[in-house]
């Protein structure tokens, strides 16, 4: 499954909507998605959303859609 993860770059600064960033990733479930992000980044996770059907198609066509793979070279910085 593909997940959209909304996050802040670190856990120290108070979250602000204007600084929220997005990454897309594959995982078996939402728990695994959260664990992968927490283990591999210092990010403050705001929301993890499963993308399916029309919402996945929309993101692929209208956003800077690039899957992040942890354990390899990350596609997001």
UniProtKB/Swiss-Prot annotation:
Belongs to the RNA polymerase subunit epsilon family. It holds the Pfam family RpoY. NCBIfam families: PRK13667.1. It catalyses: RNA(n) + a ribonucleoside 5'-triphosphate = RNA(n+1) + diphosphate. It comes from Lactobacillus delbrueckii subsp. bulgaricus (strain ATCC 11842 / DSM 20081 / BCRC 10696 / JCM 1002 / NBRC 13953 / NCIMB 11778 / NCTC 12712 / WDCM 00102 / Lb 14). It is an enzyme of class 2 (transferase). Its EC number is 2.7.7.6. A non-essential component of RNA polymerase (RNAP). GO terms for biological process: DNA-templated transcription. HAMAP family: RNApol_bact_RpoY. Keywords: DNA-directed RNA polymerase, Nucleotidyltransferase, Transcription, Transferase. One of its GO terms (molecular function) is DNA binding. InterPro entries: RpoY. This is DNA-directed RNA polymerase subunit epsilon. The keyword Iron-sulfur does not apply. It comes from the Bacteria.
């Amino acid at each position: 499954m593909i997940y959209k993860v909304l996050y802040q770059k670190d856990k120290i600064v108070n979250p602000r909507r204007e600084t929220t960033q997005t990454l897309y990733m594959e995982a078996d479930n939402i728990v695994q998605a959260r664990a992968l992000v927490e283990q591999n980044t210092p990010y403050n996770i705001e929301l993890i959303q499963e993308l399916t059907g029309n919402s996945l198609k929309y993101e692929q066509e209208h956003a800077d859609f690039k899957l992040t793979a942890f354990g390899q070279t990350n596609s997001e910085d």
